[in-house]
Curated annotation (Swiss-Prot):
Belongs to the ComB family. The gene is comB. Pfam families: 2-ph_phosp. It catalyses: (2R)-O-phospho-3-sulfolactate + H2O = (2R)-3-sulfolactate + phosphate. It comes from Deinococcus deserti (strain DSM 17065 / CIP 109153 / LMG 22923 / VCD115). InterPro entries: ComB-like, ComB-like_sf. Its cofactor is Mg(2+). Its EC number is 3.1.3.71. This is Probable 2-phosphosulfolactate phosphatase.
Length: 246
């Protein structure tokens, strides 16, 4: 079995893809599902998300739609929530569908979905559960894909990829690529999770925006057993990816 880590999304994924955007999209996605959301719809643009509000609301009034997302770390005008896992964890989303659009993570998921057979969302908070689920699904390769920040490699995503890779290697039966070796080296040399995240460029930026609590939340390891898994079906609006708890 191959274990591959892409430091940025590249595509051409033949099997299982695990998408990581620790600060903050995949961490927040897990929080939404932890707080009862029925599903997540990931869009490519804010405009697609805003256009879905009446469509989804009319299609299922018992599953009201809320929008969550950010640009440059700040909430998108017209959205109900930003991209804060702390904010999400304080809400009750039971019976709701959350439409997400973010600067990096949602795009990475769309790249992964172009060819991947199974797409999972992972963060530090669900790292071990995501690794186990990926191992159970894979037949030839697990690709851990780091979303990065504005098309640049992100320390925090590579660190988290190393956490997943380390756990998967402990399960045995993998050959690894250089991306995985880089992630494992990062995991072993950077220090503890909060140090890794807070010292990253993105972590420092969030701290400057007054969002340091999000960084601390995202640094928790394996506090959740929920794994967002891509699903298909006729009820998935065009231009979106639907994830449910797996």
């Amino acid at each position: 079995m191959r274990l591959r880590v892409d430091l940025l999304p590249h595509g051409n994924y033949p099997d299982v893809v695990v998408v990581i955007d620790v600060l903050r999209a995949t961490t927040t996605a897990v929080a939404y599902l932890e707080r009862g959301a029925d599903a997540l719809l990931l869009t490519r643009t804010p405009e697609v998300a805003l256009a879905l509000r009446p469509e989804v609301g009319e299609a299922g009034e018992n599953r009201p739609l809320v929008l969550g997302g950010e640009r440059g770390g700040l909430p998108i005008p017209g959205f109900d929530f930003g991209n804060s896992p702390v904010e999400a964890a304080a809400q009750n989303f039971t019976g709701k569908t959350v439409v997400m659009n973010t600067t990096n993570g949602t795009d990475a998921a769309h790249v992964a979905a172009q060819t991947g057979k199974h797409i999972l969302l992972a963060s530090l908070t669900n790292a071990h559960a995501a690794a186990r689920r990926a191992r159970a699904l894979a037949t030839e390769e697990i690709a851990i894909v780091c979303a990065g920040t504005d098309a640049r490699v992100s320390l925090e995503d590579v660190y988290a990829a190393g956490v997943l890779a380390e756990y998967l290697l402990a399960l045995g039966g993998f050959s690894i690529d250089d991306g995985a070796r880089i992630a494992l080296t990062m995991r072993r040399n950077v220090g503890n999770p909060i140090e890794a995240l807070s010292s990253s460029v993105h972590g420092e930026r969030l701290g400057q925006l007054g969002l340091g609590e999000d960084v601390r939340y995202a640094a928790q390891v394996s506090t959740s057993t929920l794994v967002p898994v891509l699903v298909s079906g006729e009820d998935v609006p065009e231009g979106t990816l639907k994830f449910t708890a797996g």
